[in-house]
Amino acid sequence: MGAHHPESPERLAAINDRLIAAGLDMYLSFHDAPLATVDQVARAHPREHVEELLASVPEHGIRHLDPDTAVCPSSMKAALRSAGAGILATDLVMSGEIENAFCAIRPPGHHAEAAKAMG
């Protein structure tokens, strides 16, 4: 993924900047997302797939799972934190603590399938 790829740390800063510029930040609450457990992730993805992904993370450098999906040593921690954000948001909505939720997360994972990592 090059410097012009839309998936970058700057994406989250841009989202935050737009929320502030629109005056919406005063209506938001921010929560630290926990790391999802393998058991939690395995409720949406086959456990074998999750374990294969965890094993595919390189100790150094970058490994491409497909042309659009690169992983580095910190990728799984980021993915588990993203999943944890969604789980926490769901728990907070279901408990009635908040009415709705939006998770600005990295990596987004919006192309992923249940048993296949994609973009």
Can you describe what each PLM-predicted range is?
Residues 1-119:
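HDAC/HDAC-like amidohydrolase catalytic core signature
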